[in-house]
């Protein structure tokens, strides 16, 4: 396929670096979830998804949330993003109320960017056009600035050679990396990742894990990460929040005392296996409760 060459720009590279470098404001991003309750349905036919859920997501750290399927993890993520309302309680970002009394649904905004399970790249746009799209549409960057910043960020992520490709022409793993790069183009305070690597094979997933940690080490953005993969949770997270079966609330919070930067050699260490065993035991206990509750509901 013959493609028209993309425009090139002559802006000094120092200015491009200034566009890419994280700002002082962007380095914040503490989320505080306080006594959050979410009930779906009516009083006569309701589902109690989240109940008195309280925990913090520290700024500039990776917090991974695990728990039985259907326990309410994604409900919390959607409330933070502004996609769903809460019933009561409050959620704060850097001590500013996102949702709570008088405003039960947060306003979506570029300070909180979601990377979905199934991806959301525009198939008719090239990689650089996808990456540059957000800041251009919001009017925060001109087309020239957005393309310059996008190229610099793709280069940092090892994706420089893909900018003229379309999403359907690259692997699923590469598309995931492009989506995260596109999210970071908006200079968010928080990345909200909902099982982003669920559909990947184990080898590709391991490469994506290390790529995400490299991205985190460069940007220090707060990451709220949902997964069912417990090994993934321990490898990536500074903290792992283990949720109860529905209604969702923290059962246990682990601080993963394994220094960053991490690589896959940590998976064979005794400390890693101890964290994993503790997590498996807690999640398994809740999964049994979820199964028993499902049997009773039949």
Q: Which functions belong to the PLM regions below?
A:
Residues 100, 143-162, 214:
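Conserved ABC ATPase "signature" region
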